[in-house]
Amino acid sequence: SLVGSEMCIRDSEWADLSIKQRILKSIIFWKMAHNKSIKKICICNDSSSAAFFNRKYQTMKFDRISDPYVSITLTLPDFRKDNAVKEDAIVLSHIGVLSERKGTLNILKAIKEMSVVDRNQFVFVFAGKIDLDIKDEFYRLAAECSEKYRLIIKDYFCSYEEISAICKSSNVLLIPYLNNSQSSGVLGYAAQFNVPVFSPSSNMLGKIVRKSKLGYISSDVEILGIKTFLESCLLNKLMTIDGQEYLKLNTVNSFLNTLLN
């Protein structure tokens, strides 16, 4: 028998699909649900969608599977101290593979449009390999942003230890993803270090952040929405979160139990 994994198309997303796409998706899910060779269909981090598809296709094959996080138990370096970042500076970090669909360029464009303030008030960290498709524009925008604010750029595949040190020292993790129909590994870091994320409010990513109370959600994660949020960080007390609920649901053991049982 086979176990498959699938990203779901939620009710709110059907409106964005053409009639042809809706029919095609329905056929694919129906075939998976009624294929005797498939024992289980796992939907990452979304129990309500699993229940929805079980009702729709009169089966019990759909099941939520956790998005396991890497537990960090190492003694981490002090990112702020090592990079001469003041303790009262607001550190906003964007981590992982940096690409257009992750909203990387929109973040830079938003920074560029921000009202000029003391450059020591904000530090923006971009940590992760920059996608070749956006590399030239990334560095052009980064150079312009650096005239007003401090940017720390680590354009390579960062170790878990380095990413963890960055997250631990951050005030907010920026995940204004344009493709928000799936979970994100950044949530595991946010939950472990109790650092809020700034996320889209829609689709699966928004639902997870909202349900687990992992940070800020916004219906606008384009340039204006990001700019508005960044400027609000100076005006309002920054959010604190407790990631324990998310961590309990997304252990490696939970992932393996769903996969193997």
Regions found by a protein language model. Give the residues of each.
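Short, small-residue-biased leader/transition segments that mark boundaries at the very start
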Residues: 2-8
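Membrane-proximal helix-turn-helix segments that form the acceptor-binding/catalytic region
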Residues: 18-42
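Short beta-strand->alpha-helix junction loop in the catalytic core
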Residues: 47-49, 61-77
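Conserved donor-binding/catalytic core segment of Leloir-type glycosyltransferases
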Residues: 85-102, 108-111, 124-126
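Nucleotide-activated donor-binding/catalytic signature segment of Leloir-type glycosyltransferases, i.e.
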Residues: 128, 136-161, 165
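Acidic donor-binding loop of glycosyltransferase active sites
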Residues: 165-182
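Short hydrophobic beta-strand element within catalytic cores of glycosyltransferases
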Residues: 172-173, 196-200
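A charged, aromatic-enriched C-terminal amphipathic alpha-helix characteristic of glycosyltransferases
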Residues: 222-225, 234-261
